Amino acid sequence: MGARDCTPLLLLLLSFLLFPLGLPVLGAPPRLICDSRVLERYILEAREAENATMGCAEGCSFSENITVPDTKVNFYAWKRMEVQQQALEVWQGLALLSEAIFRGQALLANASQPCEALRLHVDKAVSGLRSLTSLLRALGAQKEAIPLPDATPSAAPLRIFTVDALSKLFRIYSNFLRGKLTLYTGEACRRGDR
């Protein structure tokens, strides 16, 4: 195996090492998110965080409510949605979820006795959301999310609600990744393979 044969493998390995840091990876393959193992890794981290906070009472409640996206998916309606509308819903949900995780991180930092394990899960979620945002940009999802000027404003506003505990926030994070994000990336990757 020559040096040229190793270049793609080294770029892929480097991108996996830089993703947990939340750093943009310039040499990353643009369709890396189409590899199901990549998204599964983030889903697993979200589920671990959700499970770690399920039995947590002390230190897991927020002093204020945090706004999060509704993660329920009407599959019948989703399949009939325009690609731009799906992309817009995913981008809006990802942005709101990022704000919620950042707010949870700030509230946890200001807690009287913050648990180091909880802080680690929140930090991983922050890093994961940054990486997912970069991966979706590489997929071109951000371009699809921009509504066309002649498009009818039929897109419904993003449905939201509030949570008051870290366990609920991580449940929303996990559900969003397993639901809307997985549906959107799966379809976007299939469209790109045609």
From Swiss-Prot:
GO terms for cellular component: cell surface; extracellular space. It comes from Ovis aries. This is Erythropoietin. Its main location: secreted. One of its GO terms (molecular function) is erythropoietin receptor binding. InterPro entries: 4_helix_cytokine-like_core (IPR009079), EPO/TPO_CS (IPR019767), EPO_TPO (IPR001323), Erythroptn (IPR003013). The keyword Zinc does not apply. Belongs to the EPO/TPO family. It comes from the Eukaryota. SUPFAM superfamilies: 4-helical cytokines. Hormone involved in the regulation of erythrocyte proliferation and differentiation and the maintenance of a physiological level of circulating erythrocyte mass. Binds to EPOR leading to EPOR dimerization and JAK2 activation thereby activating specific downstream effectors, including STAT1 and STAT3. Produced by kidney or liver of adult mammals and by liver of fetal or neonatal mammals. Residues 1-27 form the signal peptide. Glycans are attached at N51, N65, N110. The keyword rRNA-binding does not apply. Disulfide bonds join C34-C189, C56-C60. Pfam families: EPO_TPO. GO terms for biological process: cell surface receptor signaling pathway via STAT; cellular hyperosmotic response; embryo implantation; erythrocyte differentiation; erythrocyte maturation; erythropoietin-mediated signaling pathway; hemoglobin biosynthetic process; myeloid cell apoptotic process. It is found in: Secreted. PROSITE patterns: EPO_TPO.
